[in-house]
Amino acid sequence: SGLQALIVRTLVESGECLVRIRERRAEDGLPVPLQLQLLEPDHLDASKTGEAPGGGFIIQGVEFDALGRRRAYWLYPVHPGEVAMFRRASLTSQPVPASSVLHLFDRLRPGQVRGVPWFAPVILKLRDLDDYDDAELVRKKIEACFAAFVTGSDDEETLGRATSDADGRRIESFEPGMIEYLAPGKDVKFATPSHAGGYGEYMRVQLHAIAAGVGLTYELLTGDLSQVNYSSIRAGLIEFRRRMEALQWQLLVPGLCRPVWQRFIATSQAIGALPADPIDAEWTAPRFEAVDPLKDIQADIL
């Protein structure tokens, strides 16, 4: 379950995940000489594109034969970002047989070779929203820095304790409970920052659009449940559960669980740990928690 959770997180972040099946020697001391190695998609040599021997071809590090079947994956020995940590490491990719690599990604169109991160459709909107939020924060900080403005014709008189900045400009400060007498002609005008209305509503609208682009509900994306009731949150969760069930039964079970199970059984039978008879497996996905079990049961009965 831990490997599956890590794979799904990588699917969300990077759009795809590689699982390399490694067979081990008997002297490694493993009950079954088989291990799984999870690899980030950065291990795949995306610059490897062109023709391959035997009439095949390579697209972004994935090699196909003449019939379009996946034949090999061109992988770096280490993560490209960690080459500097290993003196002997090289950025020369090597082909790994496709039978030893599970390439997991959500296919959105026929002929798709690589996965797409979930947040790719909204990445520009997220950047713009972050810039707007930063600009709003800077505006608030600037407004908070100006407490009052002193007007008058006498520049020598000060109000309160006076200091100077690096350029010699006078800066005065206020203290709690301070009482100060003004000289004739002096006046103090306190800053009244203008309120930028609609900030919260604008953020909600943008986050709604981002949630729709990702394929989630606003509540699941933000964790804000202040505007929902039982019916609305249940309706939103129904669509989310349908998507998760499709991910479980159309991607994880056929693309990960079943191939790993078959390789595990074959390896165990090869070393005599299991009988040679066929062994089947049934898959059970984690159940979804009910928002309100009593209301859910009543709704199912009706």
Specify the residue positions occupied by each region the protein language model found.
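Structured, contiguous alpha/beta core segments that scaffold functional sites
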Residues: G2-P193, G197, A209
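C-terminal helix-loop subdomains that flank or include functional centers
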Residues: L39-D45, T163-L302
